[in-house]
Design a protein with these regions (language model features):
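N-terminal, polar/charged subdomain of small-to-medium soluble alpha/beta proteins
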Residues: 1-95, 102-132
Length: 132
């Protein structure tokens, strides 16, 4: 499995603004997760004994991702969602994920983005970091 070509966020936004839900939307938020060289343990727990990350093996369960997207549409004020996930062997700087969410007001869209990205990252993907 090899990594995919990243999408164009400009194209995504153009598509979203042409979608039938666009008149209800007052805000779009995007997320672009990338492979970083600092290990999660170093960033989140301050672990000093971690080696730099040089890449990762990344995979996901599409059915589970589709289910959480459907669940996110049930949140108040959310009218548009698009998700792209990479796969395969990724290097530092490679895109892992793009998410675009459109909704009525800022609090609803921010909450939905945090919820969706958190569930995808914590429950639906498999990341195996490759240390240098």
């Amino acid at each position: 499995m090899s990594k995919k070509t990243s999408p164009s966020m400009d194209s995504w936004l153009k598509e979203a603004k042409a979608h039938e839900s666009a008149p209800k939307i007052g805000m779009y938020l995007t997320h672009n997760g990338i492979v970083r060289e600092s290990a999660k343990a170093k960033v989140r727990q301050g672990a000093a004994d971690t080696r730099p990350v040089v890449g990762m093996q990344f995979s996901y369960n599409q059915e589970a991702v589709d289910a959480i997207i459907a669940e996110t549409y049930k949140l108040d004020g959310i009218f548009y969602i698009k998700v792209w996930l990479n796969e395969g062997e990724l290097s530092v700087g490679d895109d892992i994920m793009y998410v675009l969410i459109g909704g009525d007001i800022r609090p609803n869209v921010i909450d939905a983005l945090q919820n969706l990205v958190g569930k995808i990252k914590n429950e639906m993907v498999q990341e195996v970091k490759i240390a240098g």
